[in-house]
């Protein structure tokens, strides 16, 4: 009996020591983040607030925090080990931070935050903890705005594609158009598909929401990927229909209302329609799976 009591006490002491290591590790992580990245984090939040193209960034840390919260009960039960292999990941993150600061690359500085956080998680929690939190860490990348050079490589082709698609649809409804680049010339007005109307804002936001949606409502990794990728053509088509609708309103309704109220309001409407289309895609995938299993 006494021997069993000693065994239980040793087990309790070991568990307490592991919990202490766990708490110490994450305390150091928080302190390091605040010391090294506080300025970058403040600037990132300001970017989310001031730039409508990346305003979805506010949702990402909330989602990542929720993922950690959901797993909170299982995390302390994992075997906590200090894994020094994670130091190499931290070192990589610090190299990216150095290159970002002295190479004047805000993107590298922000990416380094995720890399360092991943490395520290590996250091103080080992593979078991990193395995549990890998998606929460990976999803943080969605909160980081793309570099301007990559952003423009996406936005500019979207502008031309959207204007081209809308200019093909309008004549089908009796609206004569002449398109030059991203300019759509109607009988009474020229419509410019500017960067803000390229659809990249709704594309990035819808893609982010598709990732969240897939994580919560799908267990299959492949179907999660399909859901996320399907958000891209959905967002592009929705934006083209929005421009097309604006052209119809200019021609058959009121120019000022079309370019003002309708153009703004239709953005919200088409985004809700896009969410509905995402849900339909998911239902079709599930139905196809059921039919395939029955066959």
Residue ranges and their predicted role:
Residues 2-295:
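Hydrophobic N-terminal alpha-helices or hydrophobic patches in metabolic proteins across all domains
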């Amino acid at each position: 009996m006494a021997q069993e009591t000693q065994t239980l006490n040793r087990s309790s002491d070991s568990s307490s020591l592991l919990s202490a290591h766990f708490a110490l590790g994450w305390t150091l992580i928080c302190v390091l983040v605040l010391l090294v990245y506080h300025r970058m984090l403040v600037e990132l939040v300001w970017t989310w607030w001031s730039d409508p193209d990346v305003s979805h960034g506010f949702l990402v840390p909330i989602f990542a925090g929720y993922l950690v919260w959901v797993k909170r009960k299982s995390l302390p039960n994992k075997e906590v080990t200090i894994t020094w292999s994670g130091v190499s990941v931290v070192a990589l993150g610090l190299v990216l931070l150095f290159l970002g600061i002295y190479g004047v690359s805000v993107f590298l500085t922000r990416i380094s935050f995720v890399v360092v956080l991943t490395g520290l998680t590996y250091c103080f929690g080992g593979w078991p903890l990193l395995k549990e939190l890998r998606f929460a860490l990976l999803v943080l990348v969605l909160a980081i705005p793309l570099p301007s050079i990559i952003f423009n490589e996406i936005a500019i082709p979207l502008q031309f594609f959207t204007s081209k698609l809308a200019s093909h649809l309008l004549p089908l409804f009796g609206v004569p158009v002449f398109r030059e680049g991203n300019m759509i010339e109607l009988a009474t007005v020229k419509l410019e598909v500017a960067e803000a109307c390229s659809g990249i804002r709704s594309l990035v936001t819808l893609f982010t929401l598709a990732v969240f949606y897939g994580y919560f409502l799908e267990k299959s990794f492949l179907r999660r990927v399909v859901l996320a990728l399907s958000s891209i053509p959905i967002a592009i088509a929705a934006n083209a229909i929005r421009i097309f609708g604006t052209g119809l309103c200019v021609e058959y309704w009121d120019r000022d209302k079309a370019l003002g109220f309708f153009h703004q309001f239709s953005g919200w409407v088409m985004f809700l329609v896009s969410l509905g289309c995402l849900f339909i895609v998911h239902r079709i995938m599930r139905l196809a799976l059921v039919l395939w299993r029955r066959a």
